[in-house]
């Protein structure tokens, strides 16, 4: 699926009432269409993995396009530089969590990024560290306990963090 086709689909599925509801849950309503997650998943399934498309979607700055970018990107093509660029763009908890859950947790650098991002001050960058811990623990069925116990000091420190969305994610871990 081409970038223009995806954007047209998102525009056609726009729901202004959903945008109002999203704003009540702390989601930035700027550049947001209010497209449901099931619809985003369907578009991602139709699009398949496409690193180039993911880059275009992310660059659009559209809320749902960024979530979709995390769904269609190829984890094998993602670099540490891309992870840094995207994490700096996170402006809501749902984009952060969805990108971590659908893409970043499958990138070999995920564990390294946990330690780097947990030390940062930006709210959603720090939250991404804890979202990654949760995703790795949930989805990685092959690693042993030692793979996850290395994150315990990060979790303990984050559980007392005053940053609201980080605090929430640390308690969810």
Descriptions of predicted regions:
Residues 59-60, 89-90, 119-121, 160-164:
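Short coil turns that connect the paired helices of HEAT/ARM alpha-solenoid repeats
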Residues 66, 96-97, 126:
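Residue-level detector of extended alpha-helical repeat arrays and alpha-solenoid scaffolds
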Residues 166-167, 171-173:
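Conserved small/polar residues in nucleotide/adenosyl-binding loops
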Residues 70, 100-101, 130:
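Hydrophobic core positions within HEAT/HEAT-like alpha-solenoid repeats
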Residues 127-133:
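HEAT-repeat alpha-solenoid elements in large eukaryotic scaffold proteins
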Residues 1-60:
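N-terminal alpha-helical scaffold/docking segments in eukaryotic complex subunits
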Residues 48-56, 77-85, 108-116, 142-156:
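Amphipathic alpha-helical scaffolding segments comprising HEAT/armadillo-like alpha-solenoid repeats
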